[in-house]
Regions:
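Generic alpha-helix detector with strongest preference for long hydrophobic helices that associate
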Residues: 10, 60-64, 91-95, 126, ...
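Intrinsically disordered, low-complexity
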Residues: 2-91, 166-192
Length: 192
């Protein structure tokens, strides 16, 4: 049993390293910077994300925490774990903008926090600039919906949002209820 865990750890570390190396060039390209030499901005073929239909995360309704689905890419697990770390913190307008660490978060601060943990964002963004983050369209694992006044994300099928739309409470929380993206720019990270 110990040997199997060791093998899984090597695969996981290799996956994380591959994710880091592959996203380094596309990270700059997707956030308006320059792509690394030899990389192609927006090239969805350079992804370490698995092929096939992604599984959905589960919401523990007692704790409000998200449970990553089996086989989720390391970046998705990191995003979910980051969301769990600030889940239930108070809504604070402008929270999470000056720094990823804050006593409370607003919508774009909370979205920036999970994207940063996934290696998809280097500094916090307000909701307006999130409208041009990544590439257009819905992602397989992570999607960001943003307009000039609000931003939220869907990570492995769960909504990460500070608004009480469809369920009670404000502040960063996982929500099982869906929200139509009408009026929002829908964006994703290449391969996710």
């Amino acid at each position: 049993m110990g040997r199997i865990k060791c093998v899984r750890m090597r695969v996981s570390l290799a996956g994380v390293l591959a994710l880091f190396l592959l996203s380094a060039g596309s990270a700059a390209a997707q956030t308006g910077g320059s792509a690394a030499p030899g990389s192609t901005a927006g090239d969805s073929t350079t992804s370490s994300a698995p092929v096939g239909k992604p599984r959905k995360a589960k919401l523990n309704r007692k704790t409000g925490m998200a449970i990553p689905p089996p086989g989720a890419p390391a970046a998705v697990v990191a995003a979910i774990n980051a969301g769990n770390a600030i889940n239930g913190r108070p809504y604070v307008w402008g929270g999470g903008h000056g720094s990823f660490e804050s006593r409370g978060y607003d919508c774009s601060g909370a979205v920036s926090y999970v994207l940063h943990a996934a290696g998809m964002l280097s500094s916090p963004l307000p909701s307006g600039p999130l409208m041009s983050w990544g590439v257009p369209g819905k992602g397989r694992w992570i999607s960001v919906m943003a307009n000039q006044g609000h931003a939220y994300a869907v990570v492995a099928g769960l909504r990460w949002d500070t608004s009480s739309y469809g369920s009670g409470g404000s502040g960063p929380r996982w929500r099982a209820t869906k929200r139509r993206p009408h009026g929002f720019a829908v964006r994703h990270w290449t391969g996710y």
